[in-house]
Amino acid sequence: MRYDILIIGGGPIGLGFARMMAPTGCKIGIVEKQPAEKLAAAPDDGREVAVTHRTHGLMERYGLLPHIPEKEIHILREAEVINQGSPSSLHFSPEDSDKENIGYVISNYHLRRAAYKAIQDCDNIDLIEGTVSALDLGRDEATVTLATGKKLSAKLVAAADSRFSTLRDMAGIKTDKLDFKRLCIVCRIEHDKSHRNIASECFLNGLTLASIPLADYTSSLVLTMPQDKGEDVLALGDDALAEKVNAWTEKRLGRVKIAGKRHAYPLVGVYAQSFSAARFALLGDAAVGMHPVSAHGFNFGMYGAQTLAEIVTGAMLNGLDIGSPLLLQNYTNRHRATTRPLYEGTNAIARLYTNDRPLAKLVRKGILTAGKMLTPARKVLVKTLTQEDKAS
């Protein structure tokens, strides 16, 4: 079976890229190991996604947003960073922009369901259930072999198969990996004080605690800690964990109770050394797997999908080869310029704030104090969060 574009991975970025390319009329195949019914009813995995204004605009433009219940799109009005034992904190507010908020929060499973629904009316998109066993990047076309032995070919293969991408390995693209040797634990909590739509990131001794505002009096709790301590937390009963959270938060949200199942994820940062090869491109976490402290992974995935869609669409309109190495190198260059500074900055901050040596603690306090005074830098970051889709 021949396609113009083959996308490996039916997550929101892979499906989103397919939806962006659908108006060109090109023939698109999406290979996904899960059956369609599981994509349509993606389960709650506990993860909440911070969505920038630009990403929100892309979701609206390409038909994802209408498939998400309005009550499940939560306002992110402000964000604050707190360091235990420091009187200083760092605030990010819409006062530094022309918006009423700095973004939105949407559950990952709603994004997955919406992306699946957004492609249902696209006659030029095929969803193929299967697992890739081999990849051949030829001069004139790429060939993907499925575990069943079935072969699919395309002018371009785009891999959106997670930060642990097997397609990336098959293409021979190396990565810079940073294993934080930590566990990220997420669950919903209820509390008797309003969160006021403010996200909070608090760095404590030995762990990081974030609360992400959802419906009022409900938040998503995100804990990152060493693997062994994380296993201990997972073994606690709900009441015992709630008491620990009350102590860690100093009851800033009032009394807290655990209101959902706990989910745990290993914490690994990944940055591909190239985002492309001949007839091949990386999307989403397969290209850039961010530390969750950045809250920017999904946004970077959508930005990358938009960039690649613009480049490939332009090539089609001009009769150019969409799998050309030079063409795809343009995608690598543009997406690297968008992602590299925040990726490196986030990792540096994460390393600093998970280091409990006295010198590191002193530096942390100094950064928060300086950050309060560096108003121009803070405004630049808020502007990045609140910028809109340039084509919307």
Please provide the spans of the model-predicted regions.
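Glycine-rich FAD pyrophosphate-binding loop
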Residues: 22-47
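N-terminal glycine-rich dinucleotide-binding loop that anchors FAD/FMN and/or NAD(P) in oxidoreductases
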Residues: 45-69
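N-terminal Rossmann-like FAD-binding beta1-loop-alpha1 element of flavoenzymes
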Residues: 3-30
